[in-house]
Regions:
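Conserved PLP-anchoring active-site segment centered on the Schiff-base-forming lysine
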Residues: 75-89
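Conserved active-site segment immediately N-terminal to the catalytic lysine
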Residues: 152, 166-177, 186
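Conserved N-terminal alpha-helix of the aminotransferase class I/II PLP-enzyme fold
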Residues: 18-66, 86, 93-94
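Active-site phosphate-binding strand-loop segment of PLP-dependent enzymes
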Residues: 95, 107-159
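Conserved PLP-binding catalytic core of the aspartate aminotransferase-like
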Residues: 268-294
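N-terminal "arm"/small-domain region of PLP-dependent enzymes with the aminotransferase-like
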Residues: 1-27
Length: 294
């Protein structure tokens, strides 16, 4: 996190918004927390330019919990997964406890060095699940699938790193820790029409509707994590919003990619150029011996 955000957080650990209590001490049922929660949702809604047709919820836990929740809420018959690497594969395997899952495509044939652009969607499929950015293999969607089933997207590792049309998704979820704050929580943006199709034959705690109905306070919310998200959103806004952040990210990633491309083969990028991630630059050296020295 930026040093100016950390300095602000340091002060709020002893006195949050003039309460005389630190952010880790305030009650999660207090007006000051509710104000901060509402403000955080408003930041997200404004920054993502979301239609009114979306709900925003915050939950304890990270990505692994969301692998479970997406499956147990929306998998009635079968779910399609774009196999672009480890995280989509883990999500599919977890959801398989609740119904049939299958790969709508796969990049396994080339060790996940690219993003496939065709999708085999079978009848009675409830959704297509994708991972926007693949940290291990260094690939990232530039254009998103246009399919006739709800589109669910894990954006944990590139959320709010660039300007995109967030309204093209039926659900987006992200662990906060990658780009936007402290580890231990996730948030989800879910289209109301998809929520209406969610299963109710699962424990109440695992239902997204439970968090919607209780404004993310069905149980003790991850107060500090939400607070760090709030401060990061405030910082992004002050930096000029997503357009400015995207330009910064392009410059930073470009410095490394240019070094790889101009190395005469000493460094070899893993991902296809058109699918390169702006968040995670992956490369190998010319020989295994050089990699050991590196």
């Amino acid at each position: 996190m930026p040093i100016e955000v950390l300095e602000e957080m340091k002060n709020d650990l002893t006195d949050f918004r003039g309460t005389g209590m630190g952010i880790t001490e305030i009650s999660h049922r207090s007006p000051v927390f509710q104000d901060m929660l509402d403000e955080t949702k408003a930041y997200l809604r404004q920054m993502m330019k979301l239609d009114d047709d979306y709900e925003i919820v915050f939950m304890q836990g990270g990505g692994t919990m969301q692998f479970l929740m997406t499956g147990c809420n929306f998998l009635h018959t079968r779910g399609a997964y774009a196999d672009t690497g480890v995280w989509a594969h883990k999500a599919r395997n977890t959801a398989a406890f609740f119904g049939e899952t299958y790969d709508a495509n796969t990049a396994k044939d080339r060790n996940y060095a690219y993003i496939p652009d065709t999708y085999d969607i079978r009848p009675d499929t409830n959704y297509l699940y994708i991972c926007a950015n693949n940290t291990i293999y260094g690939t990232e969607y530039k254009d998103f699938p246009k399919v006739d089933v709800p589109l669910i997207c894990d954006m944990s590792s590139d959320i709010l790193s660039r300007e995109i049309d967030f309204n093209q998704f039926d659900m987006i979820w992200a662990g906060i820790q990658k780009n936007l704050g402290a580890a231990g929580a996730a948030f989800a943006v879910i289209r109301k029409g998809l929520l209406e199709k969610a299963r109710t034959d699962i424990p109440e705690y695992l239902q997204y509707q439970t968090f919607v109905k209780n404004d993310s306070t069905y149980n003790t919310p991850p107060v500090f994590c939400i607070y760090t998200l709030n401060r990061m959103l405030h910082w992004i806004w002050n930096m000029g919003g997503l357009k400015a952040i995207e330009e910064r990210n392009k410059v930073k990633a470009g410095l490394i990619y240019d070094t790889i491309d101009q190395s005469g083969g000493f460094y070899k990028g893993h991902a296809d150029v058109k699918d390169r991630s702006m968040m995670n630059v992956t490369f190998n050296l010319a020989t295994p011996e050089l990699e050991k020295d590196f």
